């Protein structure tokens, strides 16, 4: 046809080196491709300076001050998160989730009064993520010292989530603690954070013993 399309890296040579660096860093974020990174970069360039300063300050502040809860490993700005420090919660029931976003999804239902344990990932041999790469050791240490009656495994219904659920079940069963899994009403491969509250509640209420 005689028409050549310019690849994105070629177009980027016309940008300022600072803009290129910004685009490159933004493209490392999950779900952000090269074109989306460009749009975000130029949006940031058009933002008022005080808004840019607030954005960078918020990022730095979150990164420097947010830590793992010493009890459940969720992300918090306290040593012990508000849920774990709440005496009105049922500390004998622990729901295991993959990340803090999943914890938030179940909290929005307003129906779970137990506590959580956040793994910060799932076992994935394909990606080289093993049991030692997520917060499993912390979970087992917690079960050894706390009086826990039930562990509800609420990992995602992806292959990684199911693999993790089975692994956790095998670890916990010898302790005599009841282990259950949220019901299969959650779509296969679905991330809990994107599922509506009614579906999450039904999955919790319909949980099955492992």
Question: What function would you assign to each model-found segment?
Answer:
Residues 30, 49, 62, 74, ...:
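Conserved phosphate/pyrophosphate-binding and hydrolysis machinery centered on Walker-type P-loop NTPases
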Residues 140-152, 157-210:
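Long C-terminal interaction/binding lobes of large macromolecular proteins
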Residues 25, 29, 47, 62-65, ...:
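Conserved, well-folded catalytic cores of nucleic-acid-processing
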């Amino acid at each position: 046809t005689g028409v050549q399309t310019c690849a994105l890296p070629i177009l980027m040579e016309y940008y300022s080196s600072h803009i290129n660096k910004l685009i490159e860093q933004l493209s490392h974020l999950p779900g952000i491709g090269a074109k989306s990174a460009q749009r975000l970069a130029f949006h940031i360039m058009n933002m008022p300076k005080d808004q840019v300063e607030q954005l960078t300050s918020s990022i730095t502040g979150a990164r420097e001050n947010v830590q793992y809860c010493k009890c459940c490993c969720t992300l918090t700005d306290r040593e012990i998160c508000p849920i774990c420090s709440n005496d009105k919660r049922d500390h004998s029931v622990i729901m295991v989730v993959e990340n803090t976003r999943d914890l938030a999804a179940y909290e929005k239902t307003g129906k779970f009064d137990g506590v959580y344990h956040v793994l910060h990932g799932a076992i994935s041999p394909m990606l080289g993520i093993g049991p030692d790469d997520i917060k499993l050791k912390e979970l087992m240490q917690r079960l050894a010292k706390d009086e826990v009656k039930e562990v509800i495994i609420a990992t995602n219904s992806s292959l990684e989530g199911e693999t993790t659920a089975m692994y956790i079940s095998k670890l916990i069963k010898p302790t005599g603690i009841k282990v259950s899994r949220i019901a299969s009403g959650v779509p296969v491969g679905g991330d809990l954070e994107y599922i509506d509250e009614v579906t999450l509640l039904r999955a919790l209420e319909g949980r099955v013993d492992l």
